[in-house]
Amino acid sequence: MRLKCTISYDGHLFNGYQVQPGKRTVQDELEKALAVLHKSKDRIPVVSSGRTDSGVHAAGQVIHFDTPLSIPAERWPYALNALLPDDIAVKQAEIADDGFHARFSAVKKEYRYFVYTEKHPDVFKRHYAYHFSYRLNVQDMREAAKHLIGTHDFTSFCAAKTEVQDKVRTIYELDWTETADGLQMRITGSGFLYNMVRIIAGTLLDAGIGKISPDEVKSMLEAKDREAAGRTAPGHGLYLWNVYYDN
Amino acid sequence: MRLKCTISYDGHLFNGYQVQPGKRTVQDELEKALAVLHKSKDRIPVVSSGRTDSGVHAAGQVIHFDTPLSIPAERWPYALNALLPDDIAVKQAEIADDGFHARFSAVKKEYRYFVYTEKHPDVFKRHYAYHFSYRLNVQDMREAAKHLIGTHDFTSFCAAKTEVQDKVRTIYELDWTETADGLQMRITGSGFLYNMVRIIAGTLLDAGIGKISPDEVKSMLEAKDREAAGRTAPGHGLYLWNVYYDN
């Protein structure tokens, strides 16, 4: 039986999602908990919709794994949450057909990036939002964002150290909304390159403080050169929010 | 010069506010940062409006200390925040007259207690709100709360291990409001006994799940016996929110 689960994790104390020798990762904790549940010496392999970086959070990451256990789907979150550390939680589980694949069946992903602009640091947000205490021109940020919507070669918005050759992706939606204490960037796309969302967030924040004009983002895109785009915003403001599948 | 500061701290990694040998405390970190700022071998004593327990947070704790330094008041938060660990932040500072005392000048304190009732744990709230996934009758909780408003002997709502003899306090306001994902208790009073707010929160949650009737709170109060009241809700849902002074 194949199970599809929606999970959330606080990325603060993880070295990212993917298993890395000697490092604490989300995948490692999931596979350990599943091995206990299956009374198995061997790992139960878990597939996710994709990796997230060190410090990056997930409110709606999706995984799948195969299991011989006949636990009812709605009981799986309770069974796993009892074994998982408290910075990972299974929010929902459903039986998927065998053809389902957490990564290759995904048709769209949604990320959100949180910024707060208060004068002084907020201790309760220090791991969960980027403290950017500048006056921001949100209109300019929205203007700048428009240049990135659509299908483009996002080489300028991809970390240099990547093996991926084809850097064409499609961004469906990219907007900034004001929250009680700052801003939230919401972005959906066909898929995302390494650090792409964080570079976009950093670049649009540069537009917000007038370091670049909104239209410069267009030439940044066309340059196809990482050096052309702005800074990489820190990981702790970023959340994999949702992964969408064709039902 | 006496300085009055409003500070916040995330109680999760502290053994409470007050200095304790060999333990990490808020007061210890404050006094260390001040000693560095004053280039002093000795501690600069800090006085707070009162102690908070291990795991308990503060959004608006108030402290005072005396200093010969002539740093403008609005610069003190920046100077201290640069030296403090990131789970303590100075939010505001002002020069107080010499007669001001963070504890004895306080006329009213406000605490808030956060509960969330979602089915599964929320990793982002695990240190910041009490996960109480039961259906709650908020109306009963409000009815029960009414019995505690006013001036009473709160022995039943005070931890047994306390040296305080006089347990008469006045509660000015006590109400529950619904939040996006649970409930928030807001309580203001003349002062609070050891664990008093957490015992009140636990007892009113008992009323919310029908374990006690709202009117039983009245007899609990009259019993003047800790055993008569309900459970002590966990510390991580509790925040010292505000301390009020006669200006």
UniProtKB/Swiss-Prot annotation, chains A, B:
Q: Which Gene3D superfamilies match?
A: Pseudouridine synthase I, catalytic domain, C-terminal subdomain (3.30.70.660), Pseudouridine synthase I, catalytic domain, N-terminal subdomain (3.30.70.580)
Superkingdom of origin: Bacteria
InterPro entries documented for this protein: PsdUridine_synth_cat_dom_sf (IPR020103), PsdUridine_synth_TruA (IPR001406), PsdUridine_synth_TruA_a/b_dom (IPR020097), PsdUridine_synth_TruA_C (IPR020095), TruA/RsuA/RluB/E/F_N (IPR020094)
Give the enzyme's main class according to its UniProt record, as a single word.
Answer: isomerase
* GO function terms (MF aspect): pseudouridine synthase activity; RNA binding; tRNA pseudouridine(38-40) synthase activity
Q: What is its EC number?
A: 5.4.99.12
State whether keyword Oxidoreductase applies.
Answer: no
Reaction catalysis annotation: uridine(38/39/40) in tRNA = pseudouridine(38/39/40) in tRNA
Task: Give the function comment from the record.
Answer: Formation of pseudouridine at positions 38, 39 and 40 in the anticodon stem and loop of transfer RNAs.
Quaternary organization: Homodimer.
Q: What is this protein called?
A: tRNA pseudouridine synthase A
From which source organism is this entry? Answer: Bacillus subtilis (strain 168)
Record lineage: Bacteria, Bacillati, Bacillota, Bacilli, Bacillales
The protein's gene is named: truA
